[in-house]
């Protein structure tokens, strides 16, 4: 482990340098590509690429369904073919350089154009002060067509419906409403779509104890068809590592984002997540906030990697909240959502023109993404309006109100939204700079000369203005064009395709791979096992010291029952709580993998249960061995080895039962906080009716049923039977009552506590049923959570 830590530290040291050097390389590549595109506007030809890994064999398809395609363009392309060929000859060197940097970019065959039409989605909500739920529409008539080889960005303020739309497009959310999706003009089928697309979640849910290469090898063997040889799968992994620039960290632990387990950087984690989806060669890749939580340079590097994937012929669809301008420039098409409606759809570089035409202007130095989100974020409209007076008063005090009577325009100009020339503002950003004022006036004059209409004063769109903008889009040029394109796709431009059904790994392969991952995880974290082992030894020694070498006197009766209760609680409570804190992270990874169809629920559940069972057997055995001999559990003449093994068996069953309960609780509750609050209450409640604190004969009538469902009752009853059956106790003359010892036989102790002396093996099988029952319920909960079928209308 020390050597592993040293390697991790070394990788940590150069990961930043690696990220920076690769970042500079990406910038240089983008400059070369921009130079090439300016000199040669026609797209490069893509040769056929037989991707055996994804098991999909598409027929020849026409990916060039474009919003701007028409017969005139086709004729112009034919007339200019010779000129383009000359340009191609002049730029051969540039093309060769680009191909060397990305061999796969012009060899992707399975290109898919993705379209969606009239997506309407409703959710059930409860209004304040009312119990009845009402239906609220959160997506309204959303349309779009995404060409292969492009990046399609979905933007909008929080609550606009971005993630909901992406989940619907990815078939991860049932449509509660209507809508149709098309793949190359064919109505989307869930099974086909699952084979053609990859989905990258916002969070990087990865096993921290595996290296990057081990992670990709694991998913390659599970995601790729079973008939693909292992050698080809491993080669595919190496190709992806090369393509995504992960060579330097390939043998470094993934680690955790909070550095509890040190590993790769955030940008590398994001690229690993994307790489997992690339293993099967998907034609469509959907990403939820791919730059979330990353710094500026890392975000640019990740988006540059996605741009390369798009240039190779893949269709990239992503939601993104507020990208920097250099990232926004990478988008080919943009869907801007506001309150679940389409505010703009079309070319990303044409969005500003659209808003300019509607009277909303963005200054040249402002990031378009900031402008769009500031403009349509009506959720903070009321707060913004209420602060206007205070804002203007403050600016007059600081800026002196110089330059005009308007007063409040400086703050608006600072966020990049130009206002009416009649509303001259004060100093920009509270700085009295004459040069900036002159530039502002020149900009306003230029805008006035190019647009005769008076500019609206905008900080945020009012609700009325938002309604107007929503109504304007469907009748706009962009809205009419996309509707016409979708009609043509759904009626005329169908491109039939076939795919070969392939089989993934069988049950045994899935189980062995998942179990191997669990074993590796345990080996990479020996400290966790060591801590649990020390805890087990400490509990045994503590109990053994306190109850050391108990005799058979009258006072030992109480002490022997105390040993039983103490040690059962000692192994049970930690088993529950440790699972509550660990299992949620495992469930997160499972749900992500299950949604992608990586493996089935049963092999995952069995592999996890088997590994937990092994640990839950060893530790109680250690505790039981120490306690049994130190406390002198059996000293009667009928002593044999059988009571010792029965004692060990009871502690193992107690640990397994509570471990299974902890797994059930942690899989059922929404988070760790709820689990840590619920688990102790359940344990205490069931332990209260175990027969140790209250005699089972004294339980109130209306609660008489509760001891029968308390698993602690069966644990303690079996342990008491094992400790007291056929044991003879002694007493001194002073302790005798009427010449007789108060307690002579252990069998009497068992009966006085309300237990049955013949129920030991019955209780053993009841506890086995509890373990199975808790595990089956856990399996059903996981199965229910992982079910996510798409309802096609």
Curated annotation (Swiss-Prot):
Entry coiled-coil feature ranges: 67-102
UniProt signal peptide: none
InterPro entries, A to Z: AAA+_ATPase, ABC2_TM, ABC_transporter-like_ATP-bd, ABC_transporter-like_CS, ABCG_dom, ABCG_transporters, P-loop_NTPase, PDR_CDR_ABC
SUPFAM superfamilies noted in UniProt: P-loop containing nucleoside triphosphate hydrolases (SSF52540)
GO aspect biological process, one term: transmembrane transport
Compositional bias (Acidic residues): 382-398
Alphabetical keyword list: ATP-binding, Coiled coil, Membrane, Nucleotide-binding, Transmembrane, Transmembrane helix, Transport
Transmembrane domains' residue ranges: 533-553, 563-583, 610-630, 647-667, 674-694, 701-721, 764-784
Compositionally biased residues, Basic and acidic residues: 21-37
Keyword presence, Nucleotide-binding: yes
Pfam families associated with the record: ABC2_membrane (PF01061), ABC2_membrane_7 (PF19055), ABC_tran (PF00005), PDR_CDR (PF06422)
The keyword Transmembrane is assigned to this record: yes
Biased composition (Low complexity): 1-20, 69-96, 438-448
Membrane topology: Multi-pass membrane protein
One CC-aspect GO term: membrane
Residues reported in the UniProt entry to bind ATP: 156-163
Subcellular location: Membrane
Biased composition (Polar residues): 59-68, 421-437
Biased composition (Gly residues): 399-413
UniProt-recorded Gene Ontology molecular function terms: ABC-type transporter activity; ATP binding; ATP hydrolysis activity; ATPase-coupled transmembrane transporter activity
Chain ranges of the ABC transmembrane type-2 domain: 527-785
Protein family according to the UniProt entry: Belongs to the ABC transporter superfamily. ABCG family.
UniProt-recorded name of the protein: ABC transporter G family member 1
Gene that encodes the chain: abcG1
